[in-house]
């Protein structure tokens, strides 16, 4: 079974990784002058 601590750690890791993906994508999209739509 999954305990509360394991679930909390999994949720935190998922949230942090998604947040970092969004920040990384924003950084790449802003600093890419080749792709002007």
Curated annotation (Swiss-Prot):
InterPro entries: Oligosaccaryltransferase (IPR018943), OST4 (IPR051307), Ost4p_sf (IPR036330). It comes from the Eukaryota. This is Dolichyl-diphosphooligosaccharide--protein glycosyltransferase subunit 4. Subunit of the oligosaccharyl transferase (OST) complex that catalyzes the initial transfer of a defined glycan (Glc(3)Man(9)GlcNAc(2) in eukaryotes) from the lipid carrier dolichol-pyrophosphate to an asparagine residue within an Asn-X-Ser/Thr consensus motif in nascent polypeptide chains, the first step in protein N-glycosylation. N-glycosylation occurs cotranslationally and the complex associates with the Sec61 complex at the channel-forming translocon complex that mediates protein translocation across the endoplasmic reticulum (ER). All subunits are required for a maximal enzyme activity. PANTHER family: DOLICHYL-DIPHOSPHOOLIGOSACCHARIDE--PROTEIN GLYCOSYLTRANSFERASE SUBUNIT 4. One of its GO terms (cellular component) is oligosaccharyltransferase complex. It comes from Homo sapiens (Human). Residues 1-4 are lumenal. It is a single-pass type III membrane protein. The chain crosses the membrane at residues 5-25. SUPFAM superfamilies: Oligosaccharyltransferase subunit ost4p (SSF103464). The keyword ATP-binding does not apply. It is found in: Endoplasmic reticulum; Endoplasmic reticulum membrane.
């Amino acid at each position: 079974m999954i305990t509360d601590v394991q679930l909390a750690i999994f949720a935190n890791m998922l949230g942090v990784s998604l947040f970092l993906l969004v920040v990384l994508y924003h950084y790449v999209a802003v600093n890419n002058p080749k792709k002007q739509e």
